[in-house]
A protein has these predicted regions:
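Conserved N-terminal structural module of periplasmic/extracytoplasmic solute-binding proteins
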Residues: 2-4, 11-106, 279, 304, ...
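Hinge/lid segment of periplasmic solute-binding proteins
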Residues: 101-153, 209, 294-298, 365-367
Length: 433
């Protein structure tokens, strides 16, 4: 799952363990006296199915390759950037690093990750689409393998939508943003809302969905430097959300500071007709929905950019300090064989990036909305901020508070633009001197 769609509780549990184990890293006897190589693999899998699938694959590798042993180290999505930075700077990073593509830029430019360009097998590079490889390409190097991704979809109360008589969107005929706004109006009233936007972490949702409306926000000049420009296409999604909350009263104002999991009880109780969530939230719905609750997966609205949507795939990288890079890449090649990629995707309730894995019948079934998700795969693009140095600081110090204030009604669109552009460009400039 993407980082902002994981439960805090799960993050905390694995985070405590990760802080202890992370420091073991690459420095602990990578080659034994008997000549066997030991590689430490820090995995951020956290759902039970995902953890089990990953551990099983590690065990299978070790059984087949006794001369190259992989040790599974449990990591945590919570504060992973700071954890990795500390371990890299201390020379104690794991050999194989599980992360997300939007977190790699500083590590790649900082020399902490190995350039995999000449190490990756052709089977793997040809199976994963070029757009996915763009998400892990920084400068002239490739610093990770993108392997799982998830679109943002609408999880809907199927009965309520059917009773309302609204047109049900499909990937072939999605709602426009204007139609989506109108539908949420029709589904609202008597204390119920057409939609609940969980925007505790508003930046990735806003930026990634804005690709569908032609938004870009980050613009790279001929000199390679990036500037922020909040243009017409960037306005569509935030303006729609703001109007749903403030003008239409079709979106719940109380969920703006909530995480995705916090909205599920309201969805089950009929308070919200729809909730925009990451594709992997389907697992929680299957586990938590009351008996008899009927739900369906709908594509997010489309605009000038069609169904385009930004994603930050989960990635697997090799530490630059790892003394056994070829062996580490051989393990990645095994882990990401099509049949194994399917197992990882099913375990995390996400989409694989590999073409062969994506074609697997297990991921094409209508059950639990899998078919809707796979239909969106061709429209997924690297998140807008993918290669922007300084993005974490821009997001935390500028964009998050600005968007939160805008969605709450504390500031208007003009002030939002000013903060994102003026304050944001000051932050980015420090990283591009």
């Amino acid at each position: 799952m993407t980082r902002d769609s994981r439960t805090t509780h799960a993050r905390f549990l694995v985070g405590v363990l990760a802080l202890t184990l992370l420091l073991a890293g690459c420095s602990s006897e990578p080659t034994r006296d008997d000549g066997r190589v030991t590689l430490r693999f820090q995995s951020l899998a956290w759902q039970q199915e995902s953890v089990e699938a990953t551990k099983e694959l590690v065990d299978e590798w070790n059984a087949l390759h006794p001369e190259i042993r992989v040790e599974y180290v449990q990591g945590s999505w919570d504060s992973v950037h700071d954890q990795l930075l500390t371990s890299f700077e201390g020379g104690e990073a794991p050999d194989i690093v599980h992360d997300a593509s939007d977190d790699l830029a500083d590590f790649a430019y900082g020399g902490h990750l190995a350039d995999l360009t000449d190490l990756l097998p052709e089977r793997l590079t040809s199976d994963i689409p070029a757009l996915s490889w763009e998400s892990v390409t920084f400068g002239d190097g490739v610093y990770g393998v993108p392997f799982l991704q998830e679109p943002r979809v609408l999880i809907a109360d199927a009965v309520r939508l059917k009773e309302s008589g609204v047109r049900i969107p499909t990937p072939e005929h999605p709602w426009s943003w204007a139609e989506f706004r109108q539908v949420t109006k029709e589904l609202s009233g008597d204390g119920r809302y057409g939609v609940a936007w969980p925007l505790k972490e508003p930046v990735s949702a806003t930026l990634n969905l804005s690709l569908s409306a032609g938004g870009r926000l980050f613009h790279r000049g001929d000199d390679g430097k990036v500037t922020v420009r909040f243009e017409d296409g960037d306005e569509v999604v935030p303006r729609t959300i703001s109007e749903q909350v403030s003008a239409d009263r079709s979106a719940s104002p109380t969920t703006l500071g909530s995480g995705g999991s916090d909205t599920l009880p309201g969805l089950f109780a009929g308070k919200y007709a729809m909730v925009p969530l990451g594709f992997s939230y389907r697992q929680q719905i299957v586990q938590q929905a009351p008996k008899g609750f009927r739900w369906q997966v709908l594509p997010a609205p489309a605009g000038a950019g069609g169904l385009a949507q930004g994603v930050s795939p989960q990635t697997l990288s090799v530490a630059e300090d790892c003394p056994h890079k070829k062996e580490a890449v051989a393990f990645l090649d095994f882990l990401l064989q099509p049949r194994n990629m399917v197992r990882l995707a099913l375990g995390d309730w996400m989409l694989p990036t590999g073409r062969q894995a994506l074609a697997d019948p297990a991921l094409r079934t209508p059950e639990h909305g899998w078919a809707t998700g796979t239909a969106l795969a061709a429209h997924l693009r690297p998140a807008p901020a993918q290669s922007v140095r300084g993005y974490p600081e821009w997001k935390d110090k500028v964009a998050t508070p600005a968007l939160q204030e805008y969605y709450s009604g504390a500031i208007g669109l003009g002030e939002l633009r000013k903060r994102l552009e003026k304050d944001g460009n000051l932050v980015l400039a420090r990283y591009q001197r």
